[in-house]
Amino acid sequence: MKKILSVALVALMLVAAFAGCGKTETLKMGMGVYASASATSADGDTNGTGEVVATVAAVLVDKDGKIVKCELDTADNSVEFTSAGVAVAAGEFVTKYDLGTNYNMAAYGSDNNGDGVVKEWFEQADAFEAVCVGKTVDEVKALLVNGYTGNDEVMAAGCTIGVADFVKAVEKAVANAVDTGATANDTLKVAIVSAVESKDATADAAGAHEFEIAFAAAATNGGKVTAMATDTLAASFEFDAKGACTAAEELKTKNELGTAYNMAAYGSDNNGDGVVKEWNEQAAVFSTACVGLDANGISALISDDYYHGVESLQTAGCTMGVSMLAKAAVKAAQ
């Protein structure tokens, strides 16, 4: 009998041990955006310009605050206008990572670490991401020297470009990290989708290029989203009939603006519950709705008007237009 009990006890212990080994630690996920803008006025035959540079970072962070995965991308969007106040039509906006070898950094970049190789932008971003893995946010901040380039570790990894915006975006991403169902086995991806609306200046009204840039970070497993974060940046370049223009240097996303965005005061109660949530609250509702879906499922969250969400999304409290968020979320989930 004792032998039987001993065997049974060992079996139970083995089952418990294997059950414990089967548990996978869930991680926090965060997304951060660092963006700045600059502008030059038009002068004679030289067009004025407006430029938005927005870097997005996504991180998976463990219980010790160490980065398990990191993803980066940058949108460098430029627009022009003439000295007569005419908005020049913008072309397609493609991120630096998505440009791949077409960014052509290898042909014109500098060999700052002396190894005889200049990597493309996306390769250098990959190198910086790899250096971040296993580090805390303070250790990532310590990678930056002279306010612009990376230290010897970053350089040796093959990332010789300026990394100040990378560091700032990663710092924000870690600060924004929240508990999720994502694990180290998941795929992490970021996405940026940009659009611009333009109008010419008149004698009585300013012209403008108005950007809307949507960001998404998705952790996926088997094609299904385990964690999602979304955000949007609005940036406007106004110019007069002579092409004079100014722009704010540093920009805040709508999530960062929080209650200062003031959607609750002026938004519409489209679902009839008597409540209008702030933009960041509605974006959180949208992001939550994406969890468990694949890219096609996220696309299906958009109603037939191609602007608002479906009824279930509106009932949950996301009554604003979500087409740009959905485009970014779909791209991140693919």
Question: Which functions belong to the PLM regions below?
Answer:
Residues 25-334:
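Active-site- and interface-proximal helix/loop "cap" or "latch" segments in soluble metabolic
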Residues 2-22:
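Sec-dependent N-terminal signal peptides of Gram-positive bacterial secreted proteins and lipoproteins
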